[in-house]
Amino acid sequence: MTAIAPVITIDGPSGAGKGTLCKAMAEALQWHLLDSGAIYRVLALAALHHHVDLASEDALVPLASHLDVRFVSTDGNLEVILEGEDVSGEIRTQEVANAASQVAAFPRVREALLRRQRAFREAPGLIADGRDMGTVVFPDAPVKIFLDASSEERAHRRMLQLQENGFSVNFEHLLAEIKERDDRDRNRAVAPLVPAADALVLDSTRLSIEQVIEKALQYARQKLALA
C-alpha cells in the first residue's frame, strides 16, 4: 500500500507572512505548494467576472464545483491559473480579498472546494497555506503551524506592500479593515480561524522573515525526522 504523502499546514490571518513562509519551505523541502486562500480568491474573481451574486450560496456552489484552477510554480513564483489565464495579480486586489472572505463563509461552498484542495496532496509532500488547513482540510497533517502577528503589524506590512506598488493608503483605514476581517473570520460558524489543538503557534510580530522560516523549518524537520 502506498504511503499517504505528508502535509505541513500553515494557517493564520492575512498579513502574517504565510505566503512567504510557505514558498520558502516548499523550496527548501522540494515539496508541492497549495495556496488555499488563492482558491477562494479565484472563486471570488470568477463570481465577479460572471456576475454571480456573492451573497447567494445557491449561485456560488455550481461555480465552485466546476472551478478550473491550477497552481504552477515558475522561477520561485506561484502562478494561479483560472481557465487557462494567469490571474496571479488580479486576485490580489482588496476587492477580491474582501469578496473571498465573504464567499468562504458559506458551508456548501467550502464543501465544493474541499475535495479540490485535498487533491493537491501528492508525493513527496505538500505545504498547505490557508486558514483552516490544519483544522478542517488536513486534520491528520503531521506538522501544523499557526502563524500570527498583531493587527497593527499586519496593517503596517500591508501598507508598505501597497505603497511599493504605487498605491496611496491610509493606515487607520487599513487597520480597521483588517480588524473587521479578523472578527468575521475568527467568529464565523463554519471553520473559524483558530489554531489546531496540535499546532505550533508562531508569532511573527517581532521576528524577521528569516527567523520565522528558520523556526518553522527546524520544527517541521524535527517532527518529520528530516535531515
UniProtKB/Swiss-Prot annotation:
GO cellular component: cytosol
Signal sequence segment: none
GO biological process: nucleobase-containing small molecule interconversion; pyrimidine nucleotide metabolic process
Keywords: ATP-binding, Cytoplasm, Kinase, Nucleotide-binding, Transferase
Catalysed reactions, semicolon-separated: CMP + ATP = CDP + ADP; dCMP + ATP = dCDP + ADP
InterPro entries (alphabetical): Cytidylate_kin, Cytidylate_kinase_dom, P-loop_NTPase
Family, similarity comment: Belongs to the cytidylate kinase family. Type 1 subfamily.
Name the UniProt record assigns to this protein: Cytidylate kinase
Source organism per UniProt: Salmonella paratyphi A (strain AKU_12601)
Taxon lineage: Bacteria, Pseudomonadati, Pseudomonadota, Gammaproteobacteria, Enterobacterales
Chain's gene name: cmk
